[in-house]
Amino acid sequence: MFNAILSICEKNNLFPDPLYIKVDFEKAVINAAKNVLGEHLIINGCFYHLCQSTHRKLSELGLKKKYQEDYDFNEFCGMLDGLASLPLNRLQEGVDYLKSVIPLGAEDLFQYFEETYVSGTIRRINKQNTLHLTVRRFPAMFPPETWNVHQTTLNNNHRTNNVCESWNNRFCHLVGGKHPSIWTLITKIKNEMCAKLAL
């Protein structure tokens, strides 16, 4: 996808070199973006999708009812997502605080968040089939620099990619679904362009 976009840009004498992009939390997209656009690229995860990930895990762990009925549990989940608003240099302080007030039943959710978004996992590995086991820390799949919105908020930038999601929603409505024929797509785009020009 990124290569296709760059090719179209180059055909139109445009040579983008973005400094950052905002994406959902999909490792394949992040890897592709860095591979095509360069390692210098700063990846910002969408805050909405971070919260959605927490709530998906909540459901997966069978904690939805507890979330709806237990005020303290609900508040803890909000604070978990709220870690994204802390300055990066105070994040560990926030994680440590949440660890100290974790309500009963939230342990697995907290562990998921910490391993996926904060500190990663610790695994035992067996090097070269020996009897010697080594313990190694693997980094978080999405490190805090990816999902932290503190500076983004201070800079008055978007914390989510809702603008894109909204456009995509509108576009799907415009073309009558998610998989229109190429002819329907061309006709609808032409109609949209004519409507814009008429304004």
Which role does the model predict for each range below?
Residues 7-198:
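Extended amphipathic alpha-helical interaction segments
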Residues 1-6:
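Inter-domain linker/hinge segments that demarcate the starts of reverse transcriptase
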